[in-house]
UniProtKB/Swiss-Prot annotation:
Family of the protein in this entry: Belongs to the cyclotide family. Bracelet subfamily.
UniProt organism field: Pigea enneasperma
InterPro entries: Cyclotide, Cyclotide_bracelet_CS, Cyclotide_sf
Role noted for this protein: Probably participates in a plant defense mechanism.
Swiss-Prot/TrEMBL keywords: Disulfide bond, Knottin, Plant defense
Cysteine disulfide links: C5-C21, C9-C23, C14-C28
The record's account of how the chain is modified after translation: This is a cyclic peptide.
Positions in coiled-coil regions: none
Domain observations: The presence of a 'disulfide through disulfide knot' structurally defines this protein as a knottin.
Expressing tissues: Detected in seeds (at protein level).
One of the GO biological process terms: defense response
Record cross-link Cyclopeptide (Gly-Asp), residues: G1-D31
Protein name: Cyclotide hyen-J
């Protein structure tokens, strides 16, 4: 994951996970 999805996942999971993003270092990234 190298492209940030503009969402953090410190308190809640990535909502952008439906678009293929995943949590890494408290930030959502697109793999």
């Amino acid at each position: 994951g190298s492209v940030p999805c503009g969402e953090s996942c410190v308190w809640i999971p990535c909502i952008t996970s439906i678009a293929g993003c995943s949590c890494s270092n408290k930030v959502c990234y697109m793999d």
